[in-house]
Swiss-Prot record:
Annotated positions binding a divalent metal cation: 133, 137
Region (Disordered): 1-32
Coiled-coil blocks: none
A cellular component term, taken from the record's GO annotations: mitochondrion
PROSITE patterns (UniProt xref): ZINC_PROTEASE (PS00142)
Family affiliation: Belongs to the peptidase M76 family.
UniProt name for this protein: Mitochondrial inner membrane protease ATP23 homolog
Keywords, alphabetical: Hydrolase, Metal-binding, Metalloprotease, Protease
Metal-binding is among the record's keywords: yes
Length: 254
């Protein structure tokens, strides 16, 4: 799981069965972070009654739909994925589930599915950030041959991009966490959040995780696709979405 070149997979189609890692033991599941998402693999399926209109699931689905309809970050990513041949469908590619209390979402590359932690996401702004963060992982999965399960450099790069472009490290969010700084504060926030995400989903030493993040940081931090810039605020994201929507008009008039 990702906690939040050539095209690797078309998200509009079911992935071939042989691509799924199918962890053979609890040890393997913990190594890949699946233990943080207990509903993965149908281990904790809930009854229809428990999934009624008044549960976390229904609220999660409503907030997801609102994010897809109104968040400029999410709208740009959904449009970019569709343009890349990886159309995202709400019912197929998102799943509201109960998770470990330490995570808010995840991208399951084995199923091309985004997990939204319905028991940990309670506000729309939080949902918007999680959806954006995980859609960046999905976008990377669509556009590149990402080896999520055994190449830590690939995982680190996508985590850096997700932290950088999703608004996770915006001034408002950092202010709410009482994290203050001036010189390269955004870069340090991105580095720290990418590191924590890797440590949460992989059995790897902190020293190795730091080394991998440092190795790929500059190139991945400066990869702003599909935004074309770092969207530091919703206003920036709206401008980026407008530019993305108008990109074909420019070339048509040349």
């Amino acid at each position: 799981m990702a906690q939040s070149g050539a095209k690797a997979a078309d998200l509009s189609r079911e992935p071939p069965g042989e691509q799924k890692p199918s962890p053979s033991s609890r040890q393997n599941e913990e190594d890949l972070g699946y233990n943080l998402y207990p509903e993965r693999g149908s281990r904790l399926k809930k009854s229809t009654v428990e999934e009624s209109l008044f549960t976390f699931k229904h609220k999660c689905q409503l907030m997801l739909q609102f994010a897809m309809d109104t968040s400029p970050y999410a709208k740009l990513l959904l449009g970019a994925m569709k343009s890349s041949g990886c159309t995202v469908f709400k019912d197929r590619h998102f799943s509201c589930e109960d998770c470990d209390g330490t995570v808010s979402g995840g991208f399951d590359a084995a199923t091309s599915q985004i997990v939204l932690c319905q028991n940990n996401i309670h506000q729309q702004a939080h949902m918007n950030r999680v959806v954006t963060h995980e859609l960046i992982h999905a976008f990377d999965h669509c556009r590149a041959q990402v080896d999520w399960f055994s190449n830590y450099r690939h995982l680190a790069c996508s985590e850096i991009r997700a932290a950088n472009l999703s608004g996770d490290c915006s001034f408002i969010n950092e202010f709410s966490r009482f994290n203050f700084g001036l010189r390269k504060h955004h870069q340090e926030c991105v580095r720290g959040r990418a590191l924590r995400s890797i440590l949460a989903v992989r059995r790897v030493s902190r020293e190795e995780a730091e080394r991998v993040v440092d190795e790929v940081f500059d190139s991945c931090f400066n990869d702003h696709a599909p935004f074309g810039r770092i969207p530091h605020s919703k206003k920036d994201a709206k401008f980026a979405h407008r530019d993305f929507e108008n990109r074909d008009r420019y070339y048509a008039n040349l």
